[in-house]
Swiss-Prot record:
UniProt subcellular location: Cytoplasm
Protein name as annotated: Leucine--tRNA ligase
Alphabetized PROSITE patterns for the sequence: AA_TRNA_LIGASE_I
Family recorded in the similarity comment: Belongs to the class-I aminoacyl-tRNA synthetase family.
NCBIfam families registered for this protein in UniProt: leuS_bact (TIGR00396)
Residue positions of motif 'HIGH' region: 40-51
InterPro entries according to UniProt: aa-tRNA-synth_I_CS, Leu-tRNA-ligase, Leu_tRNA-synth_edit, M/V/L/I-tRNA-synth_anticd-bd, Methionyl/Leucyl_tRNA_Synth, Rossmann-like_a/b/a_fold, tRNAsynth_Ia_anticodon-bd, Val/Leu/Ile-tRNA-synth_edit
Catalytic activity: tRNA(Leu) + L-leucine + ATP = L-leucyl-tRNA(Leu) + AMP + diphosphate
UniProt xrefs under HAMAP family: Leu_tRNA_synth_B
Superkingdom field: Bacteria
Amino acid sequence: MRYDPGLIEEKWQKFWKNEQVFKAEEDETKTKYYVLDMFPYPSGAGLHVGHLIGYTATDIVARYKRAQGFSVLHPMGWDSFGLPAEQYAIRTGTHPRETTEKNIANFKKQLTAMGFSYDESREFATSDPEYYKWTQKLFLILYEKGLAYMADMAVNYCPELGTVLSNEEIENGFSVDGGYPVERRMLRQWVLRITAFADQLLEGLDELDWPESVKQLQKNWIGKSSGASVNFATEHGAIEVFTTRPDTLIGVSFLALAPEHPLVDLLTSDEQKAVVAQYIKETQSKSERDRISEMKTKSGVFTGSYAKHPVTHELIPIWIADYVLIGFGSGAVMGVPAHDERDLLFAEQFNLPVVSVLNKEGVCINSCCEGFHLDGLSGEEAKQYVINFLEENHLGAAKIAYKLRDWLFSRQRYWGEPIPIIHFEDGSCRPLRDYELPLLPPEIQDYRPEGVGQGPLAKVREWVQVFDTETQRAGKRETHTMPQWAGSCWYYLRFCDAHNSAAPWAKEKEQYWMPVDLYIGGAEHAVLHLLYARFWHQIFYEAGIVSTPEPFKKLVNQGLVLATSYRIPGKGYIYPEIAKEENGKWVAPSGEELDVRQEKMSKSKLNGVDPQILIDEFGADAVRMYAMFSGPLDKNKLWSNQGVAGCRRFLNRFYEMVSSDRVKEDNNFEGLSLAHKLVQRVTDAIEKLSLNTIPSSFMEFINDFVKLAVYPKSAVEMAVRALAPIAPHISEELWVLLGNSPGVQKSGWPSVLPEYLEGQTVTIVVQVNGKLRARLDIMKDASKEEVLALARESASKYLEGCEVKEAIFVPARLVNFVV
């Protein structure tokens, strides 16, 4: 019989859907298993095969766990708010909802074609009012706890996009989306007090089965450091400086303030006002990332003012420097150029003194004055001496600081969750009540922002201006919206109870499913999404509305999928199908030589591969199989369509084997042993997520199995059941072909018996003078004489004409003929 995926795959997809095979149930008699993908933003470009690596891995695990008898939750939804749909609306006038719904339909079609086993009954999009009603409610929980507040913040503002951008949305001073200039501005924004949870976020990492690299990234992002705050007196009040090296205090030769520091105006002398203003203007065009980059030179400007050193009482010049950030520490640093590389670059740039106060061993020198004797001390002893001095003289204190800053939560966009707050003229505000949610955005025609720092909602006066019946006052709705991160902070909880209209989730359902047992997604989310989700979850845990302190038990980052790209230097990328190889070089149709690279699949590089094209040619099961075979799950891998073709050839062979008339009711030990060993290898591979080894295990199995004169039916059934998580369509078809009722998953995961793993034969190596010459499969109970005779026969051409001086025999291991 012939294997034709085009005939069987859609049939079995309909069967799974009609029978609700993948519907998750809260069955208290079963152990639960929650396996989750980082849900996608439904872009217009659709999925390419690079997206399928993680999705295929989670699907294999979900199908395997169901077969083992677990109650499995494996859902999919859509992170559907976001800037791309809004930018498309600005260009075309198409409502973001319309664009999003169209893109979701395309994504669903692609995912269905791959045979992924999602519980479709739990599907939602973050832009569904039924969903973001609860996002708004959860935001108000943060607000009521004092964790959401408004503040004037120095932000990355893009005039062209008309919105605030995060550091991650900027590259080299330009927006990632569109490549528009970005500048720094002070704007009033909503902020979430994530710093209040800095210690919990750090401590919680120790309990997680996550990649160490991700844990370290989060630790670095939080950036906990111990030190001291030091007050430097000026005519306009003290400048507070945080330092991790109080032992170098005597070496301070300048202070540097962030351009946004509140004392800049007061400290700038009349003579310096013009140059300071120009410098601050130039700084506004730089992102924070640009400002702290490791550059050979540092920029700055003198304020014209001085501060008094708290120990020596000397006057120290006060500068403004863009490498100082207002959000870290106090927005001021003490310059110790002898012992800090950045400070040294700055001092050399502006001819400032360099005073050494530590020797090569780290012992304090040149650090004594009246009432202050630091010389000879080092390390923690020296630091503590300085802290004690500062505290006794009311000049500072011990302090712990964090790099982590409160989360800028506002966006000046339309396509995001409206913030459910009403503002009044006296500066007070009122959160909306539950019965007023969801707060829906108005229908608008113009999606462009309204002036600096105001989103498009600000233009809809009849929506903004309200009479609040609760307070009997006129008020204004908040016109900022939430960032795309908001919906993804808690979506994993909604999947526990996706269509609850009375609460974001029922407590008993959250208790049953949480935490997520396996979470797979890209490493690009190592910090922001994962940190923000952990932050919200820990708030919910403290509030008693979730049962676990952490949301994601085990995390795996899938590697990137690379594909060949072809670029005309200085012009751009071309499609692979029009590139030609001539005389060992790749050229464009114009004859221009191409720069050929292996790069991450992307729409911009024109090297993405549409999975539907491969499905149409080879079948979804072959694509799924190669998606795993292409390399270890967590490593980068190079995609090859030829590899998909190879997996299709294997499936052809597997189909022929199972449908062969050699399949009999037989207890052939060798056949059963091969099947049991296969199941054991596949089981181990799934448990360890070494999924790339599974296809080769099957290929080795079939190579040995087809040598049998008779195929034991029970062994064939074991192989089909073991293949089902990886290639589910063909497995369903073959399961029925073998005379079973539809639904291979219901048959359970095959059990492995030890006696079949051990087998009745053993493989030994045959050597001549220590060189491998043959391998032999022999019966375990074969005598030494039998083994030597078989070994001599297998190596006969190497022994011909030679005198065998000795035959070294190691039972069940080897025979070595010494000639």
